[in-house]
């Protein structure tokens, strides 16, 4: 299974909402794909990130790091070819990443 499809399905299974994918080839020098999803609370955002990393490792996808665990308003998981943003609704509305990458 391709990485992006795997990530989208896994996030959906983890009860992420408003999951969107952007192909950012030519727009970003750090990755080819951005995925953004929403969690309902800091606990859910943190758990989604932890479980996503676990599932990626089980499936053989390498993770290169994560940022934002301290507050869990917005956690970024770096998988090289894709970067996943797991955000609480307030953070997602404030930063409006969709407008940046659309």
Swiss-Prot record:
The keyword Repressor applies. Pfam families: RsfS (PF02410). It comes from the Bacteria. GO terms for cellular component: cytoplasm. SUPFAM superfamilies: Nucleotidyltransferase. One of its GO terms (biological process) is cytosolic ribosome assembly. This is Ribosomal silencing factor RsfS. Interacts with ribosomal protein uL14 (rplN). Belongs to the Iojap/RsfS family. InterPro entries: Iojap/RsfS/C7orf30, NT_sf. It is found in: Cytoplasm. Functions as a ribosomal silencing factor. Interacts with ribosomal protein uL14 (rplN), blocking formation of intersubunit bridge B8. Prevents association of the 30S and 50S ribosomal subunits and the formation of functional ribosomes, thus repressing translation. Signal peptide: none annotated. One of its GO terms (molecular function) is ribosomal large subunit binding. Keywords: Cytoplasm, Repressor, Translation regulation.
């Amino acid at each position: 299974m391709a990485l992006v499809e795997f990530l989208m399905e896994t996030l959906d299974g983890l009860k992420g909402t408003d999951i969107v994918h952007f192909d950012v080839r030519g727009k970003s020098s750090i990755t080819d794909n951005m995925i953004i999803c929403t969690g309902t609370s800091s606990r859910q955002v943190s758990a989604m990130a932890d479980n996503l990393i676990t599932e990626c490792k089980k499936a053989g996808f390498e993770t290169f790091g994560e940022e934002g665990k301290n507050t869990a308003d917005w956690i970024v998981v770096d998988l090289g070819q894709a970067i996943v943003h797991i955000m609480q609704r307030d953070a997602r509305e404030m930063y409006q990443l969709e407008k940046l990458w659309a």
